């Protein structure tokens, strides 16, 4: 064993020794160094590869440790800085002292200076070739040891130079970026200096938004949009008040400015391009130097606006952006997806919640007291058949700094749209079967328009709200509901809420709450609805009947987006549309007549109600909740008791009230059953065409229908203020407050429809919006005001009709009427809260005291967002400007005073001469009386401004402010045409001087402007405004019932119908306002008196009365006439007797300074009206006006002018019809509604004579022409309205004097004219204007404006022309000239304000933008002028066939075919037409009438007056009995004596005028209607 073990061991040793030997042998060999080095290298490489992972891990661990360590020493700080530099790929090193750390790259370096203790001293950044500059932001970050932010800055600096090319090229690119930043900074400073805007204004409206300069690594930031919800604190839900120190970078929507490399080469500036420090236009556009080789370089790079998060944009937006920049937005074709899907993703991505939401495009919103479910119909087909597609945009390329403002505006528009749609996208989860869950469908209609459909809060029907995002701060809204559906709220209310909260759920909640409020206020609604349904059960017009659709694209969103255009689309277009709508409906719906009548006719509604609950009844059925089902009270009894009602039910074409009031967006939209999509698609063109085609057929088709419609129109005007709304937009009534300025729309704009040829429903709303803006107060203020007013007004049971369009808008004409008429409403927030409805809504939406509305939740009053938006300059130009200019001066005060004044003047003052006078004076002083002109507003506002202003003016009150001005303008206008002067042709000019031109002779005219101003200051103008307001009825052309009409329709019930709304037409500064305020007020007073005198027109009478009371002479006269015709009937009567004396006085007054042309006119008007009436022919023509020969306009002008007119009229049958025509018209007006129409023409002549007569004596040619025109228009309208009213009540049947036929004819003609008035693109609008009472008035105003404006310049010419015209046609010529001369500044806005008798908040029916006579005088102004003049003229010729010259203005009227210049006797009409035609001789024609025709007219009129006075007395007595209850209404009218008078006249006039303007101006096809009206009137005679 032992031996064996040893053996094994030895073997092992031997093996080991052999192994060692081998090793020794191997390593003893000489190995070459190359092999050794190679071997070592291989080993090292392997080692690196192996340790790479571990190294990274070690580095990350080290960095984590460093972050966890507190930096308290110098070494710790330098270590941390070096670590951060390494993370960003930058080098770092320390200085010799160890206290400076440098972080470096090729293009820049950062120097961090520390003290020995490691505390930070300073941080400097040095770009290539520049000296180091201290960076406070970096200092702050390092002092706070915020190393993450410091690291982000370093990343930003690195990315800034992440450009192609070498360092030299990168340096040039940096220089280009620097120059761009300097230019943008200058632009921001320019905007701030020009507007002194706060942070929110800068964000929403600034040319470059809220600019934050580049700092450290943060690029220059442009904050371009912030929504109301962004301004709420997430934690406390309290509003964030922005100031310069608390605008965080992350707030709202931002874009950073940078330069990046591109594949293409672009020429970029490397030096600043802005020269000087002042912008070159009102959009703050700086002056840029041109791009040259000296200041720019070709670089493979371009400027970019980059967004932190890609923004969903529509396909159309992409195209707009590329058109703006000229550079493709995407290098490769983007992928498109449904826009709503992208918006949904964008909204959900804001929430950090990682849990995906399985929404299926269905979202829930839990609101106070309500739970909503929203379905976003992303695949809904657009009109082109495709769904709304979009894509995501992360950056926008541009080359020039001047492109930035355009790009930002486009982005703001898109983001505003996205914000509204995104407001429905919430992560809230509710059960499908939750009790009370409300379902809503959001459906795209275009890239900027969408609809929200939901169940009617009261009825079992579908309601649709169409929202059109016109720009980032203006959203126009239109509510579509069934004709029989209860009123929900006004379009303006919705728009206000939307703009305030930019949230669909909050808006829907506010709408529902508003509807509930209305229902609570109108408990009898269901009963009424049932009755109406029973009535028209057999022949209910199809919901989609054209009539409804008639809404004419106007109300729908289609139409110009500009506030101004919007307005035209609104009031004028609307009015036109309304008439058209009615006809359309007639044609389309043969059997809905009863229903349509009930639903459309506020008068009918009020008649049905019997209770005199005109207010509630007033709204069109679609419009008013009350009216929704016309009140049923005792329909049979009512029908029996009211011939007018019988007539309405009998022949009334199946006109939707909504159609009639279609002007009012809400009304129209409510009434229109057509889907928003349809309406939108059809657009205004469709409507126009429809109207045009329909109207003409309508005439032949419904002769009786035409008559009936006319009657209805005037009735509508009387009975439903909503009609006034019609002209504006549905919300116009509210608009006075709401109306920013439409504005401001521009948009609307808002109820200040321009005579724009194209009807634009959607614009209307916008207009209103602008109107709102112009209203002046912030949305918040307005909202709070509204909330307050709403609390007051709700009692009126008006949703938000209190002051303005809401009434009509709300589709509750009656409702709105009551608010309008309610003195409470007027007085309540006369000055600033005309928007009762909006107030309520806002209260709801904004969390008014009474409401738990989320609005409060979302934005408190403190939130400036919406107000800013509303007031934003981007309001389409009709924002604050309108409101501020017009109303800021005395308007508000006047308005305030006017609330009660309006009531008093409208109601009481008119009723009692002394009383009216006292009230007027007390409230408005003499000027108060001068309502008709008041609306002109002393300020020299641009047409848009004026309109806006009118709109802005809260109502009559507001107007009163303007009234003073407008009174002057009115006077001027009266020189131009008292009634129309409200429209204030001169005012249109917006030239103060011209405007100053008064109805009185040139000398007087000139003086008058001061008076007008005085009136403004005195505050009388407010009254006048009120008086003018009656002029507004024209606004409600659709509801041809004008105040007079309204009063009338109310009168028919024999109950005090809701006070007749006063209609004030405000005209731009340029507007001609003649006479000093006191003088003017006197004038108005006279006008009022004459109005009152015409008992036919209650409103007129009231107007008259107030007018009388205001004017000194008129005062006594008025006290007599006023008290006698206090109810309008008595007023009329006394006017008859005292009218003669008044007319005499008037004439005298004309000469007397104290009397002042206006007073004279007023007196003249009254006298004229009486006398006119005596002029059997015109009277006969206007049969209904027997008692009210000259409707307010007539009255206004006729008193003094009447004498003159009466004589001149007689002598001038062949003479220039201007005077004659006016006289005849005046008398005609007095004679009957037809007379009213002719009256308007006559009125014009009468005005010229009357107003000129007193005033006209001084300024017969030009001022007369204008005043005659105005007066004529007003008178005619008023007369028609009033007459119809009266007839409706006293002679509901067809008065012996053809009153009804006349009225009907007038209405039909108006409608036809309206429909017809589509000859030209602009014509339709004008036509529409004409059609709308407002339109008519406005056209008058525009014409007068021209006259007035021109008058200033042309006034002297006019005066000269007067002499000339006396013999020749100088009146017409003058008018023309005025219009021509006014061409330049003629454009203006005429505002028609309708006030309620009860003194309810005034409402602005329509805002008419008057175009320059030269440019649009033919189309816009002319039609307007033509409208008023034509109106009067046809009536005149119809009225007084012997005044064939007058007939020219009626050239359309069969009796007076001549529309030639020789027909200058048309005076108003002819002038309107001619001036539109720019035919000097025509103008001259008008003036001549006043001069030589005056005496004959006076005689003639006196004779006729005697006859008519008797009739009037009789009528008056009847009316008194019937109207005593309505006394208030007349008084309301009386609030604006002249206005009332005129407005009534205007109403009729407007209606007729609408037709006539068509004739007068080729644009207006209304002429045909005029002919028909004239025929009817003549035949009726």
UniProtKB/Swiss-Prot annotation:
Residue ranges, annotated region (Interaction with GATA1): 681-715
Region (Interaction with VDR): 542-789
Residue numbers covered by motif LXXLL motif 2: 645-649
InterPro entries noted in UniProt: Mediator_complex_subunit_1 (IPR051999), Mediator_Med1 (IPR019680)
Annotated region described as Interaction with the Mediator complex and THRA, given as residue ranges: 1-670
Biased composition (Basic residues): 1496-1505
Family membership noted in the UniProt record: Belongs to the Mediator complex subunit 1 family.
Oligomer and partners: Component of the Mediator complex, which is composed of MED1, MED4, MED6, MED7, MED8, MED9, MED10, MED11, MED12, MED13, MED13L, MED14, MED15, MED16, MED17, MED18, MED19, MED20, MED21, MED22, MED23, MED24, MED25, MED26, MED27, MED29, MED30, MED31, CCNC, CDK8 and CDC2L6/CDK11. The MED12, MED13, CCNC and CDK8 subunits form a distinct module termed the CDK8 module. Mediator containing the CDK8 module is less active than Mediator lacking this module in supporting transcriptional activation.
Protein name: Mediator of RNA polymerase II transcription subunit 1
Gene: MED1
């Amino acid at each position: 064993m032992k031996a064996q073990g040893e053996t094994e061991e030895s073997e092992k040793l031997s093996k080991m020794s052999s192994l060692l030997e081998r090793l020794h042998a191997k390593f003893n060999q000489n190995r070459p160094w190359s092999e050794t080095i190679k071997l070592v290298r291989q080993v090292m490489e392997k080692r690196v590869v192996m340790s790479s992972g571990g190294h990274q891990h070690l580095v990350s661990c080290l960095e984590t440790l460093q972050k966890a360590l507190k930096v308290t020493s110098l070494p710790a700080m330098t270590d941390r800085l070096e670590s951060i530099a390494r993370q960003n790929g930058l080098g770092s090193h320390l200085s010799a002292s160890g206290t400076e750390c440098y972080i470096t790259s090729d293009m820049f370096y950062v120097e961090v200076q520390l003290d020995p203790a490691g505390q930070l001293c300073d941080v400097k950044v040095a770009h290539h070739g520049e000296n180091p500059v201290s960076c406070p932001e970096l200092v702050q970050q390092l002092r706070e040891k915020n190393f993450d932010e410091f690291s982000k800055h370093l990343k930003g600096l690195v990315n800034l130079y992440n450009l192609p090319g070498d360092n030299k090229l990168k340096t040039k690119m940096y220089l280009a970026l620097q120059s761009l930043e300097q230019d943008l900074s200058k632009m921001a400073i320019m905007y701030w200096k020009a507007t002194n805007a706060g942070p929110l204004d800068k964000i929403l409206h600034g040319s470059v938004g809220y600019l934050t300069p580049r700092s450290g690594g943060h690029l220059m930031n442009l904050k371009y949009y912030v929504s109301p919800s962004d301004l709420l604190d997430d934690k406390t839900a309290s509003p964030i008040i922005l100031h310069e120190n608390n605008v965080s970078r992350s707030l709202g929507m931002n874009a950073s400015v940078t330069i990046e490399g591109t594949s293409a080469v672009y020429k970029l500036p490397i030096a600043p391009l802005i020269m000087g420090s002042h912008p070159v236009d009102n959009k703050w556009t700086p002056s840029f130097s041109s791009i040259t080789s000296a200041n720019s370089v070709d670089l493979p790079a371009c400027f970019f606006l980059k967004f932190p998060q890609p923004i969903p944009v529509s396909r159309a937006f992409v195209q707009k952006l590329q058109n703006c920049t000229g550079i493709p937005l995407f290098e490769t074709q983007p992928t498109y997806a449904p826009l709503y899907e992208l918006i949904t993703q964008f909204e959900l991505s804001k929430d950090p919640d990682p849990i995906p939401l399985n929404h299926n495009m269905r979202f829930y919103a839990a609101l106070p007291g309500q739970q909503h479910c929203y379905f976003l119909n992303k695949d809904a087909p657009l009109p082109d058949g495709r769904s709304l597609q979009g894509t995501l945009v992360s950056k926008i390329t541009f080359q020039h700094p001047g492109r930035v403002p355009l790009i930002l505006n486009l982005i703001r528009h898109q983001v505003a749209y996205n914000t509204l749609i995104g407001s429905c996208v919430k992560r809230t989860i509710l059960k499908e079967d939750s009790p009370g869950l409300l379902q809503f469908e959001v459906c795209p209609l275009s890239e900027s328009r969408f609809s929200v459909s939901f169940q009617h809060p009261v009825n079992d029907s579908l309601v649709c709200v169409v929202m059109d995002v016109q720009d980032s701060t203006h959203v126009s809204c239109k509510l579509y509901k069934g004709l029989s559906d209860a009123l929900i709220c006004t379009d303006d209310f919705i728009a206000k809420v939307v703009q305030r909260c930019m949230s669909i759920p909050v808006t829907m909640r506010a709408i529902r709450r508003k509807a509930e409020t209305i229902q609570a206020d109108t408990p009898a609604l269901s009963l009424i609805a049932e009755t109406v349904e029973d009535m028209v059960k057999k022949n209910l017009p199809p919901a989609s009947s054209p009539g409804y659709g008639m809404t004419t694209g106007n109300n729908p969103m289609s139409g110009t987006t500009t506030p101004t255009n919007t307005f035209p689309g609104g009031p004028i277009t609307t009015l036109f549309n309304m008439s058209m709508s009615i006809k359309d409906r007639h044609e389309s719906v043969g059997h809905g007549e009863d229903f349509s009548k009930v639903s459309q006719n506020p008068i009918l509604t009020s008649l049905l109600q019997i209770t005199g609950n005109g207010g509630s009844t007033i709204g069109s059925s679609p419009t008013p909740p009350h009216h929704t089902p016309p009140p049923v009270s005792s329909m049979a009894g009512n029908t029996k008791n009211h011939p007018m009602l019988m007539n309405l039910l009998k022949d009334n074409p199946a006109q939707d009230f909504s159609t009639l009031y279609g002007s009012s967006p809400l009304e129209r939209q409510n009434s229109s059953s057509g889907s928003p999509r349809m309406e939108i698609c059809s657009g205004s063109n469709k409507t126009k065409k429809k109207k045009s085609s329909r109207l003409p057929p309508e005439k032949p088709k419904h002769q009786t229908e035409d008559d009936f419609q006319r009657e209805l129109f005037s009735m509508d005007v009387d009975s439903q203020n909503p009609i006034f709304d019609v002209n504006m937009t549905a919300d116009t009534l509210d608009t006075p407050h709401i109306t920013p300025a439409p504005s401001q729309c521009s948009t609307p704009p808002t109820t200040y429809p321009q005579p724009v040829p194209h009807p634009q429903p959607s614009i209307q709303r916008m207009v209103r919006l602008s109107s709102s803006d112009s209203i002046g107060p912030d949305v918040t203020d307005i909202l709070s005001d509204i909330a307050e007013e709403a609390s007051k007004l709700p009692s009126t049971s008006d949703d938000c009709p209190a002051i303005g369009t809401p009434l009509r808008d709300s589709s509750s004409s009656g409702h709105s009427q009551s608010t309008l008429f309610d003195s409470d409403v007027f007085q309540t927030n006369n000055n600033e809260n005309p928007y009762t409805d909006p107030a309520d809504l806002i209260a709801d939406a904004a969390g008014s005291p009474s409401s738990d509305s989320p609005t409060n939740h979302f934005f408190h009053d403190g939130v400036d967002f919406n107000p800013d938006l509303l007031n934003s300059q981007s309001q389409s130009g009709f924002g604050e400007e309108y409101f501020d200019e017009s109303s800021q001066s005395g308007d508000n005060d006047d308005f305030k005073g006017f609330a009660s004044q309006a009531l008093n003047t409208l109601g009481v003052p008119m009723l009692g001469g002394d009383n009216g006078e006292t009230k007027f004076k007390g409230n408005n002083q003499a000027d108060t009386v001068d309502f008709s002109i008041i609306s002109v507003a002393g300020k020299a506002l641009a047409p848009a401004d004026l309109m806006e202003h009118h709109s802005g003016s809260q109502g009559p009150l507001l107007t009163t402010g303007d009234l003073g001005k407008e009174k002057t303008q009115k006077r001027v206008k009266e020189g131009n045409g008292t009634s129309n002067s409200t429209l204030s042709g001169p005012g249109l000019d917006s030239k103060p001087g011209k405007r100053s031109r008064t109805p009185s002779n040139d000398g007087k005219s000139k003086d008058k402007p001061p008076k007008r101003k005085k009136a403004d200051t005195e505050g009388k103008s407010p009254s006048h405004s009120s008086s003018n307001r009656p002029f507004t009825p024209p606004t409600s052309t659709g509801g041809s019932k004008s105040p007079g009409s309204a009063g009338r329709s109310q009168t028919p019930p024999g109950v005090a119908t809701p006070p007749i709304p006063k209609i004030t037409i405000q005209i731009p500064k340029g507007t001609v306002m003649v006479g000093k305020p006191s003088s003017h007020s006197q004038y108005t007073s006279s006008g009022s008196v004459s109005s009152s005198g015409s008992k036919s027109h209650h409103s007129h009478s009231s107007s008259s009365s107030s007018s009388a009371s205001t004017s000194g002479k008129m005062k006594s006269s008025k006290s007599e006439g006023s008290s006698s015709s206090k109810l309008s009937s008595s007023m009329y009567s006394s006017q008859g007797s005292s009218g003669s004396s008044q007319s005499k006085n008037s004439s005298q007054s004309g000469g007397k300074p104290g009397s002042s042309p206006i007073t004279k006119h007023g007196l003249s008007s009254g006298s004229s009206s009486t006398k006119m009436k005596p002029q059997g022919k015109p009277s006969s023509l206007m049969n209904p006006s027997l008692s009210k020969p000259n409707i307010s306009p007539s009255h206004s002008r006729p008193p003094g002018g009447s004498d003159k007119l009466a004589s001149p009229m007689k002598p001038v049958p062949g003479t220039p019809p201007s005077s004659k025509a006016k006289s005849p018209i005046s008398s005609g007006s007095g004679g009957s509604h037809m007379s009213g129409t002719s009256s308007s023409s006559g009125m014009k002549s009468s005005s010229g004579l009357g107003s000129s007569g007193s005033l006209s004596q001084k300024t017969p040619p030009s001022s007369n022409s204008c005043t005659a025109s105005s007066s004529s228009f007003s008178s005619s309208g008023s007369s028609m309205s009033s007459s119809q009213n009266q007839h409706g009540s006293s002679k509901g049947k067809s008065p012996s004097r053809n009153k009804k036929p006349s009225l009907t004819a007038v209405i039909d003609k108006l409608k036809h004219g309206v429909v017809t008035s589509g000859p030209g693109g602009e014509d339709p609008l004008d036509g529409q204007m004409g059609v709308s009472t407002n339109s008519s008035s406005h056209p008058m105003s525009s014409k007068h404006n021209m006259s007035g404006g021109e008058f200033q310049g042309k006034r002297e010419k006019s005066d000269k022309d007067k002499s000339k015209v006396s013999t020749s046609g100088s009146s017409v010529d003058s008018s023309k000239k005025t219009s021509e001369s006014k061409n330049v500044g003629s454009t203006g806005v005429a505002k028609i304000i309708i006030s309620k008798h009860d003194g309810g908040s005034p409402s602005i029916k329509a805002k008419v933008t008057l175009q320059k006579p030269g440019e649009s005088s033919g189309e816009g102004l002319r039609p307007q002028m033509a409208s008023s003049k034509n109106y009067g003229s046809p009536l005149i010729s119809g009225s007084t066939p012997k005044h064939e010259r007058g007939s020219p203005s009626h050239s359309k009227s069969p009796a007076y075919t001549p529309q030639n210049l020789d027909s200058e006797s048309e005076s108003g009409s002819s002038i309107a037409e001619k001036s539109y035609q720019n035919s000097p001789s025509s103008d001259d024609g008008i003036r001549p009438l006043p001069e030589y025709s005056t005496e004959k007219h006076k005689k003639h009129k006196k004779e006729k007056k005697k006859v008519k006075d008797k009739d009037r007395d009789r009528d008056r007595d009847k009316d008194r009995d019937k109207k005593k209850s309505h006394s208030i209404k007349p008084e309301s009218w009386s609030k604006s004596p002249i206005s009332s008078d005129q407005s009534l006249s205007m109403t009729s006039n407007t209606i007729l005028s609408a037709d006539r303007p068509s004739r007068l101006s080729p644009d207006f096809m209304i002429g045909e209607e005029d002919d028909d009206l004239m025929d009817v009137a003549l035949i009726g005679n």
